[in-house]
A protein has these predicted regions:
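N-terminal structural segment of carbohydrate-active enzymes
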Residues: 1-82, 87-89, 94-98, 149
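Active-site oxyanion-binding pockets that recognize sulfate/phosphate
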Residues: 9, 141, 169-172
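Alpha-helical packing segments of well-folded alpha/beta enzyme cores
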Residues: 15, 19-22, 65, 69, ...
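Extracellular/periplasmic catalytic domains that process cell-envelope and extracellular macromolecules
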Residues: 27-29, 74, 109, 163-164, ...
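Aromatic- and acidic-residue-enriched segments that line the glycan-binding/catalytic groove
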Residues: 45-57, 86-129, 212-224
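Short amphipathic alpha-helical segments
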Residues: 49-54, 136-138, 168-170
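Active-site-proximal helices and loops of the catalytic beta/alpha 8
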Residues: 67-78, 87-88, 93-104, 158-160, ...
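Active-site-adjacent "subsite" loops/lids of carbohydrate-active enzymes
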Residues: 94-156, 160-165, 175
């Protein structure tokens, strides 16, 4: 906080190699799992505005350093879990590319973009559906087949790719805002990559009796979370 205001563009350091260097200390504390907040390339310091699901943010490290951390942690009995933000991206992303910072044609830049149908535009390009109305977080269409392929395709999809890179699973941001069908496919993709993979969801209310967006959620049946 500076002057009582939240500074989402202030960065304070901390890297994957720094965590790896502290593994003996963490082991001595009795820690057996490290849950990382989002580490993918993003504009903000919190990184819940994903810019590229395939790349670790350079401020945190590299994809190779993530795998090295997971391998080193596993040797001392510690697992590493990633945070998945799959309900929305950042406006400053490969996929939306509001500011043209990425070489790809983003959905905001042209209707011929391969990512155009990932989003919902009411009046193109300025009026689009955003997570809780926050325009910096354009909401994804979770039912879009190409988006699902990007997420779940064996080996190459985001979900299995990062498990195969070393993550023990996923903690899902706003899981109760993800459709049940999407969650089932996500869990199946994770388990196909690693039968022991963990899929943990952020659900604010009683998960055994949860109704979200007019639908009773089946979190306790074992096929979503």
């Amino acid at each position: 906080l500076r002057g009582g205001k939240y500074q989402e563009l202030d960065f304070y350091g901390g890297t994957l190699t720094g965590i790896q260097e502290k593994l003996p200390y963490l082991k001595d504390m009795g820690i057996d799992i490290i849950y990382l907040n989002p580490i993918f390339r993003a504009r903000s310091n919190h990184r819940y505005d994903t810019g590229d699901y395939t790349q670790v943010d350079p401020l945190c490290g590299t994809n190779t350093e993530f795998t090295e951390l997971c391998e080193a942690a596993k040797k001392v009995g510690i697992r590493v879990m990633l945070d998945g933000v799959f309900s929305h991206t950042g406006e400053d992303s490969v996929y939306f590319n509001h500011f043209g910072h990425y070489p790809t044609l983003g959905a905001y830049q042209g209707q011929s973009s391969p990512y155009f149908d990932w989003y919902t535009f009411n009046h193109y390009p300025e009026d689009y559906k955003a997570w809780w109305g926050i325009l910096s977080l354009p909401e994804l269409r979770k039912d879009n087949p190409e988006y699902q392929k990007f997420m779940f395709q064996p080996h190459e999809g985001v979900v299995p790719r990062w498990i195969e890179a070393g993550s023990c699973g996923w903690r899902l941001d706003v899981a109760d805002e993800l459709p049940v069908d999407f969650l089932r496919k996500l869990r199946a993709a994770a388990k196909a990559a690693d039968p022991e993979a963990v899929v943990l969801g952020e659900v604010w209310e009683d998960a055994s009796n949860k109704v979200a967006y007019g639908e009773t959620r089946c979190y306790c049946t074992g096929d979503t979370l």
